[in-house]
């Protein structure tokens, strides 16, 4: 009679924890640096007046649209490349990077041309304010030239991350941060003999920092990296048709999921935008807190994604299951810590913003809702994206998000708003999916049907 093997909920494989830390730390630092770049931009441009701030914000919405599309390409690259990395199949990884680069350049080129040809029309879709449109057009027509450079650097960073080289992204982002902040100060306000350029200076600083970021990524990939050893000819060679089909098949639902999330984000802003300016300010403050805490959650989830893809690609199903159980326990702990962190500093955090007392009161209420919702986010997001999606079931997250967004989140928030509910109640409706998805995640993850080897 054989004895059933006891399930292990916390793996004793020390390499899991070492790899998790080695990947999560630089990815989280890269996210923090990216956050710092945006924060520095907002801080400096805010001194130019409301129209300039609004113009930059609206201009950046076009760039955000490209970033969402690129997230789909980058995630597809990471999932497929990580699984082939588990097999140490560098030939297939290079072909995946080639496909990603072509897709990224196509998206970047289309978005760039649209922004250059129809800048005021695109800004006009977002706001009727003529002064904001004028400022946004100035900014967008300069920043648009950076879109191609951005796509190249993001694909290279994603490729390096998939083969467990996450530090390169952090280092490249740090270079971009230094360049961006330095040039912002020099060009916006005029320094070292350079005339003050205002919003044009902010746009030029962003463009130059993107060029430097792209150049650093290319130099690293071509002359420093020893794992992939990329060459220019790798991007122009013939690609296996079956691999190209896999890229489209598994990438399409990921891209669709990003589009759904973009619609969700814009609509949520519109719902809260119908309340008073104090509520809108409170929502902005809560958004800053979300971005801050999401840095480490996303970094850890990205690390789990690489580990999962590599282990699935190696064919060790039992180890994947063991890692999945450990991941669930670990991120429950992360959720408790994150919730406690938000609740602990919310009173101090709202005082950093020069807003009315009413806005601070709303913000404090929103942060309580956010703290509770982050309990769910910290569990379901790493489980569904870091395990299920990276493990091979790339379409499930798209279907799950679509159902929750269009059948639960937006309808409940719209109804609550229409009935005159308190803003905090509406905000809770907008965040309720983060808790509800935990039920789905528990069932989906522990059935293990998501473990699919996508390699050939």
Segments from the language model and where they lie:
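Helix-terminus/linker motif at the lipid-water interface of multi-pass membrane proteins
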Residues: 32, 36-54, 123-130, 186-197, ...
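Short alpha-helical transmembrane segments in multi-pass integral membrane proteins
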Residues: 1-27, 81-148, 194-251, 308-374, ...
């Amino acid at each position: 009679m054989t004895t059933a093997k006891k399930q292990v909920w916390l793996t004793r494989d020390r390499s899991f924890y070492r790899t998790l830390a080695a990947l999560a730390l630089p990815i989280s630092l890269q996210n923090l640096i990216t956050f710092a770049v945006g924060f520095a931009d907002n801080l400096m441009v805010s001194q130019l007046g409301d129209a300039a701030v609004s113009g930059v914000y609206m201009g950046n919405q076009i760039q955000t649209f490209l970033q969402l599309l690129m997230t789909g390409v980058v995630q597809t690259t990471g999932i497929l490349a990580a699984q082939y990395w588990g097999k140490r199949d560098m030939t297939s990884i290079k072909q995946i990077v080639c496909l990603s680069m072509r897709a990224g350049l196509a998206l970047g080129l289309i978005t760039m041309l649209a922004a250059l040809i129809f800048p005021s029309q695109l800004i006009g879709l977002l706001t009727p304010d003529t002064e904001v449109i004028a400022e946004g057009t100035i900014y967008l027509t300069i920043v648009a030239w950076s879109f191609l450079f951005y796509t190249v650097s993001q694909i290279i960073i994603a490729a390096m991350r998939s083969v467990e080289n996450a530090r390169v992204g952090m280092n490249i982002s740090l270079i971009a941060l230094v360049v961006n902040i330095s040039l912002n100060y020099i060009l916006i306000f005029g320094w070292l003999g350079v005339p003050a350029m205002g919003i044009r200076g902010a746009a030029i600083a962003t463009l130059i920092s993107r060029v430097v970021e792209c150049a650093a990524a290319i130099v690293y990939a071509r002359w420093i990296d020893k794992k992939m050893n990329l060459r220019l000819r790798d991007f122009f060679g013939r690609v296996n048709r079956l691999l190209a089909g896999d890229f489209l098949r598994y990438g399409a639902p990921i891209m669709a999921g990003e589009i759904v999330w973009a619609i969700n984000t814009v609509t949520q802003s519109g719902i809260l935008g119908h309340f008073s300016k104090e509520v809108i300010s409170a929502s902005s403050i809560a958004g800053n807190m979300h971005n801050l805490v999401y840095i480490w959650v996303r970094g850890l989830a990205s690390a789990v994604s690489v580990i999962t893809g590599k282990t699935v690609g190696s064919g060790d199903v039992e180890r994947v299951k063991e890692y999945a159980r450990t991941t669930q326990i670990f991120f429950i702990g992360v959720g408790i810590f994150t919730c406690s962190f938000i609740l602990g500093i919310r009173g101090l955090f709202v005082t950093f913003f020069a807003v009315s007392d009413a806005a601070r009161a709303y913000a404090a209420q929103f942060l309580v809702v956010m703290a509770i919702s982050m309990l769910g986010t910290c569990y379901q997001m790493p489980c569904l994206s870091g395990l299920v999606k990276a493990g091979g079931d790339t379409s499930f997250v798209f279907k799950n998000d679509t159902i929750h967004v269009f059948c639960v989140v937006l309808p409940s928030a719209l109804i609550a708003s229409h009935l005159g509910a308190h803003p905090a109640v509406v905000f809770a409706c907008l965040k309720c999916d983060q808790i509800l998805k935990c039920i789905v995640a528990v069932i989906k993850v522990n059935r293990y049907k998501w473990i699919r080897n996508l390699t050939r």
